[in-house]
Amino acid sequence: SIVWNSSRQAWVVASELARGRGFVLAKNTLMVLTVASAVGNAFAQNVSSGVVSNGVVSSGETQVVYSNGQTSNATVNSGGIQNVNNGGKTTSTTVNSSGAQNVGSSGTAISTIVNSGGIQRVSSGGVTSATNLSGGAQNIYNLGHASNTVIFSGGNQTISSGGISDHTNISSGGQQRVSSGGTASNTTINGSGVQNILSGGSAVSTHISAGGTQNVSSGGNASDTVVNTSGFQRVSAGGTATGTRLSGGNQNVSSGGKAIDAEVYSGGKQT
């Protein structure tokens, strides 16, 4: 701690003052508490043990959650960063516009809310569960794993090299992008939600509800997709769809696209 030394007219380390005078005046003690409080409010707290609740990470600040540390109900504002790794855990973090949450090596983030302009990155063995993308973005790559993400209107999830997503729910206006080396399994597409499978990307066991769309681009692969009434699967030239089940939905296969072992049930249509 630092204190004001009236004789020196300067701030000094408290331990030095104690050695020189043998005590610290009550006035100086009050100053110590005031300075400590100000520092605590000005900077994000790194967390390596215990639980820190309701913290705020502001512009230019980085909060690191690691080891056995946990945070609850943190808020990451514009320009702020929350890094979760090495056994750290966060619950119910809110990431606002231009804020970021990075979930890395053995880190876990549960029930994060990512608002418009915010981003959550999941990589290097990091795990997330029940992230809500309320207009924000989630990028999953390099052995990152995201489960039970919900993508609302304006939100987007990108799964790339080595990234895994399972049980994502895409609501109307939301979008999932599966690019090279990424895998999405058990995705549900609702309303006007969209799943785009790009070259080298793979989607397994997608369920498409009314108004939802799965686009399989050149080099992309979709397997065991279920297309329900008024849902769409579109397979472009060079794309491949295997084992699609049309339960009242539609499959459109462009010239050069492949549809293998499709099953067409009542109300289903393949063109």
Model-inferred region functions:
Residues 45-70, 78-271:
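Extracellular beta-strand-rich, repetitive "passenger/adhesive" scaffolds
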Residues 1-34:
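Bacterial Sec-dependent N-terminal signal peptides
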Residues 40-44:
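Sec/Tat signal peptide C-region and signal peptidase I cleavage site
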